């Protein structure tokens, strides 16, 4: 009997030791995952523009939400900056993946776009040269992206996209459309890719909205439905403060049925094209 009790006690100690070891490994994994999330979040904060450029008659606002309630920091980002010719550039993009590598690559893409824009401000050329740089870096990740240039002197908006979801354009005069012009392949796949640009003159007040696919597409939500929802929302609220409009648009992501990260960039303008033509001051 004493021998059996000793065996039982030994077995219990072994089980407790194994349980302790398992608990320790689980805690180590939790700490490692937490560190990864914190690192990715820090990289994300460095990439997301803390303050978007504002010009007379033009305001911009952005929104970003991470995946899985903040547990996955993905590769979605937006950016805005003044360019050497006096125009302003805006970009939004989505790097493949939801991890530290995606967040780090997102920073590289943003840096490439800004660097290229010091040499040329044409959106087609900006995307083309950035694509060639990323291909030369030989990363396994690809990037969808839209880049646009707004000229405050003329009111012209020129944009190009690389495998990215369309933008939405609405005016206070009642016009609203999903901008379905031709685009090129995502960045980082093939060198020498061509990215067609579209141009429009912003002659009246309205809003131009850029977004990532996490806002409009998911397992339970076809992208066409998502784009229509955003278009209806922007058409009804294009006069709204851009920060409020961005907050409304990002909520469409709640309908998608998944937990992808999502980003929105809203440009609200006051008819600078008309102002430029009439010479008003």
Name these PLM-found stretches:
Residues 1-33:
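Short, low-complexity N-terminal regulatory "tails/caps" that precede and couple sensory modules
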Residues 3-11, 122, 240-241, 278:
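Intrinsic-disorder/low-complexity, polar/charged segments
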Residues 8-12, 41-44, 130, 215:
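Short acidic/polar alpha-helix capping motifs at helix-coil junctions
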Residues 15, 203-204, 210, 215-281:
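C-terminal catalytic subdomain
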Residues 20, 110-118, 216, 231-238:
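Short amphipathic alpha-helical signal-transduction/dimerization elements
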Residues 24-207, 256-281:
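… and, occasionally, acidic/histidine-rich disordered N-termini of signaling adaptors
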